[in-house]
UniProtKB/Swiss-Prot annotation:
This is Segregation and condensation protein A. The keyword Cell division applies. It comes from the Bacteria. PANTHER family: SEGREGATION AND CONDENSATION PROTEIN A. Its main location: cytoplasm.
């Protein structure tokens, strides 16, 4: 059964690379190409396995990373030194690094503009604020913004867990469940659990097909703002909560 699922929030390969750099606290000026390539290809493989609409530029970036990786493995010779006599040896990562830095600046500016727009809108639409609890709220650490790439990482971890627990001789009975039905089931499940549940606890079935449908249903509920995804710190467990739009 095919689930061709398009998610607009996947902004492109540079966005994925920046996510990996942030997630693994990598120095953008000294990218470990072998490690970042392995992680990048793992994400792309998972996206394709889920039948997400993977744009061609992701595959182009994959080829670029593999090319840079191969160049980094080549021995350095005297002829690699630039003709101008400088001792600097051309770094195969240089162009990618510059693109990432430029894209990071663009994202920061876009985020700042969006925040200013929201602040201006609140000046005219926001009711009077009660400041009595402001100090207490400031002292509380806010959850991280969970991206779709974080969700992919959580799904990869889940698949590894399930695979490790699954007996080799397990016989799989194929079931086909519509995404819409699974979305309804998840909302009912959250209601029974008091409105909040661990992301991993949504996957009670070990069958790969049902796990894929469940994950796509979670993404669709995220897109519809029917659920809220929370994660306190990087690599922490992800929790799913009902939103006021889920009723």
């Amino acid at each position: 059964m095919q689930y061709n699922f398009k998610v607009e929030a996947f902004e492109g390969p540079l966005d994925l690379l920046l996510h990996l750099i942030h997630r693994y606290e990598i120095d953008i000026y000294n990218i470990p190409v072998a490690d970042i390539t392995e992680q990048y290809l793992s994400y792309v493989h998972t996206m394709k396995e889920l039948q997400l609409d993977v744009a061609s530029e992701y595959l182009v970036m994959a080829a670029t990373l593999l090319q840079i990786k191969s160049k980094m493995l080549l021995p350095k010779h005297e002829e690699d030194v630039l003709d101008n006599g400088d001792d600097f040896i051309d770094d195969p990562r240089q162009e990618l690094m510059e693109r990432l830095i430029e894209y990071k600046k663009y994202k920061q500016v876009a985020t700042e503009l969006k925040e200013r727009e929201q602040e201006r809108a609140q000046l005219y639409t926001r009711p009077p604020i009660d400041f009595t609890s402001l100090q207490q709220e400031e002292e509380t650490s806010l959850p991280l913004d969970v991206t779709l790439y974080d969700m992919l990482a959580a799904f990869q971890k889940l698949m590894r867990r399930k695979k490790a627990k699954k007996p080799v001789t397990t016989r799989i009975t194929r079931q086909e469940i519509p995404i819409e039905q699974r979305m309804t089931d998840i909302l009912k499940q959250l209601k029974i659990k008091g409105g909040r549940q661990s992301f991993y606890d949504l996957f009670v079935d070990d069958e790969r097909e049902i796990m894929v449908v469940t994950f796509l249903a979670v993404l669709e509920l995220m897109k519809n703002q029917q659920i809220i995804i929370e994660q306190e710190h990087n690599f922490d467990e992800i929790f799913v909560s009902s939103s006021n739009k889920s009723a």
